[in-house]
A protein has these predicted regions:
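N-terminal, positively charged/glycine-rich alpha-helical extensions of SAM-dependent methyltransferases
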Residues: 1-22
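C-terminal alpha-helical "lid/dimerization" subdomain adjacent to the S-adenosyl-L-methionine
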Residues: 157-203, 210-211
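A short acidic, Gly/Pro-enriched loop at the edge of an enzyme's catalytic core
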Residues: 113-123
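Class I SAM-dependent methyltransferase SAM/SAH-binding core
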Residues: 54-55, 59-112
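A short glycine-rich, Lys/Arg-flanked "PGG" loop and its adjoining helix->strand segment in the class I
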Residues: 138-150
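Core SAM-dependent methyltransferase catalytic element
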Residues: 203-205, 211-233
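Conserved alpha-helix/loop element of class I SAM-dependent methyltransferases that forms part
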Residues: 33-50
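A short SAM/SAH-binding and catalytic strip from SAM-dependent methyltransferases
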Residues: 122-136
Length: 233
């Protein structure tokens, strides 16, 4: 079952990502193959069963499909600021015939969207938090943390800058090129990468596991929220 909602007026940030939506899948495959998808799904088979799942900045829906397969019967809320990205996610879900759960699509800018408090036992933000400058990132994490149920899991996959050379130089060059491209084509607000760890820790989340890939450029995280969910392992 699929439901949709649109909240608020589209921002420049939302509208600009619409143009990339039809091309995002082939661009990802051309530049990274299946590496990003492996990061998105790194912990899906390890985390406890989730009943209420929040996917923010989901984009073209590849993690959404896998969550529907892994957590059948769960309720999923998929939020994205780009209507065209949401359309891609809907199409992918229908094509994979994975809609065996309740999926609600919400067209909203996360900076202006207020989720239900203490509701979701799984939050996922894959290749999304890198879109924000520092003050925006702090607001986004604070807002999403309110939505986390006690003991919730927070999965995130993203880029990072390794601490050691020559990996550090390589990652800096790649990220510089990426930010130039996305700032030019999408009016991305961030000029550089801001690690979310500090803000997650402030909200009571603790890093449970981290996997790195691609010479340290990519990482997949499993964070755990404060409190007990009753089914954490």
């Amino acid at each position: 079952m699929v439901a949709s909602a649109s909240l608020g007026s589209p921002s420049l940030f939302a509208v600009s990502f619409d143009a990339l939506a039809p091309h995002y899948r082939w661009m990802e495959f051309l530049l990274a193959g299946e590496k990003l998808q492996r990061c998105r799904t790194a912990f899906l088979d390890d985390i406890p069963a989730a009943r209420n799942i929040l996917l923010v900045g989901e984009g073209h829906g590849r993690c959404l499909v896998e969550c529907c397969r892994r957590f059948q019967g769960a309720r999923l809320v998929c939020v994205d600021a780009s209507e065209q990205m949401l359309a891609q996610a809907r199409h992918r879900l229908a094509a994979q015939r994975a809609a065996t759960t309740m999926v609600e699509f919400i067209h909203a800018d996360v900076l202006n969207w207020s989720p239900s408090a203490r509701t979701f036992d799984l939050i996922a933000t894959n290749f999304f938090l890198d879109c924000f400058c520092r003050d925006q990132l702090e607001r986004v994490i604070c807002r999403l943390a309110i939505a986390a149920a006690p003991g919730a899991s927070w999965l995130l996959a993203d880029f990072q800058i390794p601490s050691r050379e020559p990996r550090r130089i390589r990652s800096r060059l790649i990220l510089w090129a990426m930010y130039v491209f996305f700032r030019t084509t999408t009016r991305l607000p961030a000029k550089r990468l801001t690690p979310p760890d500090l803000f997650l820790n402030r909200e009571g989340f603790r890093l449970h596991r981290r996997i790195e890939a691609e010479w340290g450029l990519l990482h997949s995280d499993w964070w755990r929220g404060p409190g007990e969910s009753g089914n954490l392992t």
